[in-house]
Amino acid sequence: MECLMAVILAAGEGKRMKSKKAKVVHEIQGIPLVEWVYRSVKNAGIDEVVLVVGHKAEEVKEKMGDKVLYAFQEKQLGTGHALMQAQEYLKDKDGYVVVLYGDTPLITSKTISDTINYHREQANSATIITAVLNNPDGYGRIVRSGDGSVRKIVEHKDASLEERNIKEINSGIYCFNIRDLTEALKELDNNNSQGEYYLTDTIEILINKGKKVGAIKVEDSSEILGINDRVQLAEAGRIIRSRILKRHMKNGVTIIDPDSTYIDEDVEIGIDTVVYPSTIIEGKTKIGEDCIIGPGSRLVNAQISDRVEVKNSVVLESSIDNDTKVGPFAYVRPGSVIGKNVKIGDFVEIKKSVIGDKTKISHLTYVGDAEVGKNVNLGCGVVVVNYDGKKKNKTIIGDNAFVGCNVNLISPVEVKDNAYVAAGSTITEEVPEYSLAIARSRQTIKEDWVIKKGMLRQEKE
């Protein structure tokens, strides 16, 4: 049975990244570089994926989990040596293997699929993914024979003047016949100035054996961009962001200013939703239809239903149901569940709380560790005092309750259904249903106090 595999090389140190982390776990739009490569491989229909790890191997394994097979390169002795560490998975197999790098996040599943199909159709022993660059300086050139097959790969420093004029370059990504590759790896040596085993030498070995080596040009040369430093990381991020935004726009989402909008790969957005400038949508956020998001909002792993507005606000790991309005300048913290037709207004903070349908929390309010019922009104300046210095306590506010301005609810406490709390109160005990709670001192008037105390304020001439 024909086998289809991929080997992703991800063992390098990545010194130019100047980072404490492994290069391939640096993220673009919420996904590690190596995960981008893995997803493209899987979407191309390849089920068996081997990841060659080395530098900070445990960190890479933690990110990738058990969805890949692992090979370990103890010493970084070149790309060919890295591939040699995966030989146990190639042994005695017939079929094809795609070899690519964990720091090439822009490679697409279409390019991988096209390469495999071309490799089969041409009956190649190896197929190289190539690109045409206006400025190919520093890259290995593809020298073709008259029939279009690859005659050799010549490195820039070794190329003649005529060869340096060739603009087709080697991407370093290949499709091999597995049996031909395993035989070529047996002949690979490190007889060079660096003392390393080069993957490109396998191509020379196959050509010298009379095997057919072909090349397929990638349509977009940015796909082969390798990430070696933070500048290239930012450039790849710009390209991936553009792809993501275009996909959403083609699927019926309006994005007012793509240049200032950041949306992670796993975000889902329904049709006719409008995303305003300076908005960041991260993680596995899911947004329904006909929503207004932004300007200046940040959503992380949020679940947003239909016709919701989130303006100039932050929503973290929480859900918001249909027809609710949030903001401006609201903060919905993790673990919150906001119902339908709710208003969360300016400078309101909700933390790990449930807010019932049709409830209004319009401004300057903190609600933490609380259950707030349906059709409740919390006035300006209400504070749920949930922390006693040792632990967080729960507050329950029943349906149709009314809590006036500048009220402190000292948790644990309960305001029953249909109860009222007068403005300025500090509530420490249960407020029964249909009752009014007043917890403030009576107002005292001292007549002529200002004159008697000499406190009269007069404008200076």
Curated annotation (Swiss-Prot):
One family name in Pfam for this protein: Hexapep
Residues bound to Mg(2+): 103, 228
Main localisation: cytoplasm
Region N-acetyltransferase, annotated ranges: 252-461
Compartments where located: Cytoplasm
Residues bound to UDP-N-acetyl-alpha-D-glucosamine: 9-12, 23, 73, 78-79, 101-103, 140, 155, 170, 228, 333, 351, 366, 377
GO molecular function: glucosamine-1-phosphate N-acetyltransferase activity; magnesium ion binding; UDP-N-acetylglucosamine diphosphorylase activity
Binding of acetyl-CoA, residues: 386-387, 423, 440
Positions of the UniProt region annotated as Pyrophosphorylase: 1-230
Entry cofactors: Mg(2+)
Span list, region Linker: 231-251
Free-text cofactor note: Binds 1 Mg(2+) ion per subunit.
Disulfide links within the chain: none
GO biological process entries: cell morphogenesis; cell wall organization; lipid A biosynthetic process; peptidoglycan biosynthetic process; regulation of cell shape; UDP-N-acetylglucosamine biosynthetic process
The EC number(s) this enzyme carries: 2.7.7.23, 2.3.1.157
List of catalytic residues: 363
Annotated function: Catalyzes the last two sequential reactions in the de novo biosynthetic pathway for UDP-N-acetylglucosamine (UDP-GlcNAc). The C-terminal domain catalyzes the transfer of acetyl group from acetyl coenzyme A to glucosamine-1-phosphate (GlcN-1-P) to produce N-acetylglucosamine-1-phosphate (GlcNAc-1-P), which is converted into UDP-GlcNAc by the transfer of uridine 5-monophosphate (from uridine 5-triphosphate), a reaction catalyzed by the N-terminal domain.
Subunit structure: Homotrimer.
This protein's name: Bifunctional protein GlmU
Species assigned in the record: Acetivibrio thermocellus (strain ATCC 27405 / DSM 1237 / JCM 9322 / NBRC 103400 / NCIMB 10682 / NRRL B-4536 / VPI 7372) (Clostridium thermocellum)
